[in-house]
Regions:
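Flexible, low-complexity linker/loop segments at domain and module junctions
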Residues: 2-22, 123-135, 328-334, 365, ...
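ACP-dependent fatty acid/polyketide chain-elongation machinery
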Residues: 2-84, 106, 282-292, 389-404
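Conserved beta-ketoacyl condensing-enzyme motif
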Residues: 22, 46-199, 228-239, 332-348
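Acyl-CoA/ACP chain-elongation machinery
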Residues: 53, 219-265, 298-312, 342-349, ...
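A glycine- and small-aliphatic-rich helix-loop capping segment at beta-alpha/alpha-beta transitions
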Residues: 35-40, 150-164, 214-217, 237-250, ...
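Glycine-/small-residue-rich "gating" segment that lines the acyl/pantetheine channel
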Residues: 161-168, 209, 213, 230-286, ...
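Active-site-proximal alpha-helical scaffold in enzymes
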Residues: 95-108, 177-180, 185-188, 194-229, ...
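Condensing-enzyme catalytic core mediating Claisen C-C bond formation in acyl metabolism
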Residues: 19-23, 50, 251-328, 336-337
């Protein structure tokens, strides 16, 4: 458009920043599905890591033989079966279930599509459709590391043995990264913005930042956001194994994830989804929604250092933290709780501790810091969403969950990691930190 003094004034009025709150949470994790079960496991430090195996694969070739899978998961326990559901990979199944939980928690009501009625079918193509809400004012942005690797590996093996006859026409469409948001949008008749974000283990957090911006700029009233991942497959698990990024404490799985502990030797891979409902403040108030908290700041940076290792000085990660605090307009001493990336790898925990001391100075020693990954394992692209839920529940309950398995202090990791026991403390402002391969923060 042509820029004039009048147009500048008009656009300034039109583009005022809207406030963004969280009105629903849906955790699907190895330690609990739904916010109540998840929270109970968090505050009690209850993990569910165990030895794993892959069909027709010799496990002795894997250095790490433990993980945190979600046992007994069945999508039909959450939503009605449909033609769509039978083609979904495990990642999308987690995302659909978590979305259902989050929307239900947010008080969003849905009607189920009656596919027997032709006129109804033409109006509503999804399995469910929202009542009393404009589907074009609801969007979905989700983070994912590697979508539907279970399907990809399955069809790759069939291709090697049977050629093209072994490949389903549904194989390729369901392994696009964007298919995860397409599946969620189709299931719940969400017709606003829909796309996936893939920035390794920061994917869920980056998706939430993009959803925040979408609402803040007036794009939608409500966003389904967070992340999902299901990486416990022979190839993906093997890829991390050859990187020597995972713990080899195979005989003691529940002690293997030990962020900031001197005996840590790598992360434990988990799987699942953490979905949140972001909503414009006035929209949430008008419908009487429960508000968990408000998103007040964010920061994103790149290390520009290494494909897998974090920059040892942590400066770029620290810049992202500083940017989020500056945007929020809050002082260092106002942060009451930090949920760190806290992976249980030798380098990450050391760099993250150094960064927090650099950003917060002496105040860093007075802030409770607890790693959700000590309990859930590392949920990869889902981690940011699940850990944001941890922060919101800490704010709501006034309790910081523990970092479990913290037994041997590391002189280079000397902050308050809320060791082994939950702690009651009022939380007004919480900070969630994510980082990923490629130096994405």
């Amino acid at each position: 458009m042509k820029i004039t003094e009048q147009s500048i004034k008009e656009m300034s009025v039109r583009n005022y920043h809207k406030r963004v709150v969280i009105t629903g949470v849906g955790p699907v994790t190895p330690v609990g599905i739904g916010k109540d079960a998840y929270w109970e496991s968090l505050i009690n430090g209850k993990s569910s890591m165990r030895q794993i195996s892959f069909p027709n694969k010799e496990m002795s070739q894997y250095r790490c033989q433990i993980g945190a899978p979600i046992d007994g998961f069945d999508l039909s326990h959450f939503v009605e079966k449909s033609k769509l559901s039978k083609h979904l990979g495990r990642t999308s199944q987690f995302a659909v279930a978590a979305t259902w939980l989050a929307l239900k928690d947010a008080g969003i009501e849905f009607n189920m599509n009656d596919f027997e009625k032709e006129e109804f079918h033409h109006k509503h193509t999804g399995v469910y459709h929202p009542k009393n809400l404009d589907p074009y004012q609801i969007g979905v942005i989700l983070g994912v590391g590697v979508e539907a690797m279970d399907l990809m590996e399955h069809f790759h093996e069939r291709f090697l043995s049977r050629g093209l006859r072994g490949i389903s026409p549904f194989a390729l469409p369901n392994i696009y990264l964007s298919s995860i948001t397409s599946h969620v949008a189709q299931y719940f008749s969400i017709r606003g913005t829909s796309y996936a974000v893939s920035t390794a283990c920061a994917s869920g957090t980056h998706a939430m930042i993009n959803s925040f911006l979408q609402i803040q700029g007036g794009g939608e009233d409500l966003m389904v956001t967070g992340g999902a991942d299901a990486c416990i497959t022979p190839y993906v698990f093997g890829g991390f194994d050859v990187l020597r990024a995972m713990s080899v404490r195979n005989n003691d799985p529940n002690k293997a994830s030990r962020p900031f502990d001197q005996e840590r030797d790598g992360f434990v891979m988990g799987e699942g989804s953490g979905v949140l409902v972001f909503e414009e403040l006035d929209h949430a108030r008008k419908r009487g929604a429960h508000i968990y908290g408000e998103v007040v700041g964010w920061g994103m940076t790149a290390d520009a250092y290494h494909l897998t290792d974090p920059d040892p000085n942590g400066k770029s990660l620290g810049k992202a933290v500083k940017d989020s605090l500056e945007m929020a307009g809050i002082h260092l001493e106002e942060i009451d709780y930090i949920n760190p990336h806290g992976t249980s790898t030798l380098l990450n925990d050391r760099v993250e501790t150094r960064m927090l001391k650099d950003v917060f100075g002496k105040q860093a020693y007075h802030i409770p810091i607890s790693s959700t990954k000590s309990i859930t394992g590392h949920l990869m692209g889902a981690a940011g969403g699940v850990e944001a839920i941890s922060v919101l529940l800490a704010i709501e309950k006034g309790i910081s969950h523990p970092t479990i398995n913290y037994e041997f202090p590391d002189p280079e990791c000397d902050l308050d990691y809320v060791p082994n026991q939950a702690r009651r403390k009022e939380v007004r402002f919480g900070l969630s930190i994510s980082a990923g391969f490629g130096g994405v923060n």
